[in-house]
UniProtKB/Swiss-Prot annotation:
This is 2,3,4,5-tetrahydropyridine-2,6-dicarboxylate N-acetyltransferase. The keyword Transferase applies. Coiled coil: none annotated. It is an enzyme of class 2 (transferase). It comes from Oceanobacillus iheyensis (strain DSM 14371 / CIP 107618 / JCM 11309 / KCTC 3954 / HTE831). Pathway: Amino-acid biosynthesis; L-lysine biosynthesis via DAP pathway; LL-2,6-diaminopimelate from (S)-tetrahydrodipicolinate (acetylase route): step 1/3. The gene is dapH. GO terms for biological process: diaminopimelate biosynthetic process; lysine biosynthetic process via diaminopimelate. It catalyses: (S)-2,3,4,5-tetrahydrodipicolinate + acetyl-CoA + H2O = L-2-acetamido-6-oxoheptanedioate + CoA. Its EC number is 2.3.1.89. Keywords: Acyltransferase, Amino-acid biosynthesis, Diaminopimelate biosynthesis, Lysine biosynthesis, Repeat, Transferase. GO terms for molecular function: tetrahydrodipicolinate N-acetyltransferase activity.
Length: 236
């Protein structure tokens, strides 16, 4: 896990990027060569990729040959790339936004719309449900469930601030907010819609706004919040 100062240095040192994709048509077999952009074109149409400042100059340089173009752009001076997901041993569904320098354990599940910021850690077998947010440095242990729409607050600055820590075997209901610096103890359950402003002891059920202790976890409660390993099964 990166500490706050390492994350700050990573962002500061990173090359800021404004990548674009451009669909072009025209006399493309006559386009000038370029070492700074990638072109995938035939004689009449194609696609080019590169940094906006390079693409902008290239379009101007070749404007007499380009009949029309459409530009796609989704970021400006971005400091943190997306995590390369190809070799992550987890189930990651379309639409999840996961920044670089995130750690994802084996068999984890990241659902559609989840947002995972730099420095976050997700343990083995943990599910991050739809539209949940893990802020910078938020740490979730093994075999947890973070409910849909829940927010684990991030702390990158000030660098001395403590991140959110969710220990192993915790179940967080939907639309829960866990504030900066909070630790949720092993085996605990946080009821849906709660706002957690204080540390949660292990094996405790809490709920409300702000969250308060409702009871210690018993076998009946455990059975209602069972983590199903079948949902974490991978083919490989």
């Amino acid at each position: 896990m990166m500490d706050a100062n390492e994350i700050i240095q990573f962002i500061s040192d990173s090359k800021k990027s404004t990548p674009v994709k451009v669909y072009v048509k025209g006399e493309l077999d006559k386009l000038s060569a370029s070492n700074t952009i990638k072109t995938f074109v035939d004689s009449k149409s194609g696609t080019i990729f590169g940094e906006w400042k390079d693409i902008q100059a290239y379009l101007e340089e070749n404007k007499s040959l380009i009949e029309d173009y459409i530009i796609e752009n989704d970021r400006r001076n971005s400091a943190i790339p997306m995590l390369d997901l190809k070799n992550i041993n987890a189930r990651i569904e379309p639409g999840a936004i996961i920044r670089d320098q995130v750690e994802i354990g084996d068999g984890a599940v990241i659902m559609m719309g989840a947002s995972i910021n730099i420095g976050s850690v997700i343990g083995e077998g943990t599910m991050i449900d739809m539209n949940a947010v893990l802020g910078g440095r938020a740490t979730v242990g093994k075999n947890c469930h973070i409910g849909a729409g829940s927010v684990l607050a991030g702390v990158i600055e000030p660098p001395s601030a403590k991140p959110v820590i969710v220990e192993d075997d915790v179940v967080i209901g939907a639309n829960v907010v866990i504030l900066e610096g909070i630790t949720v103890g092993k085996g605990s359950i946080v009821a849906a819609g709660s706002i957690v402003t204080k540390d949660v002891a292990p094996n405790t059920l809490v709920g409300g706004t702000p969250a308060k202790v409702l009871k210690e976890i018993d076998e009946q409660t455990k059975s209602k919040t069972e983590i199903k390993q079948e949902l974490r099964k991978l083919d490989n």
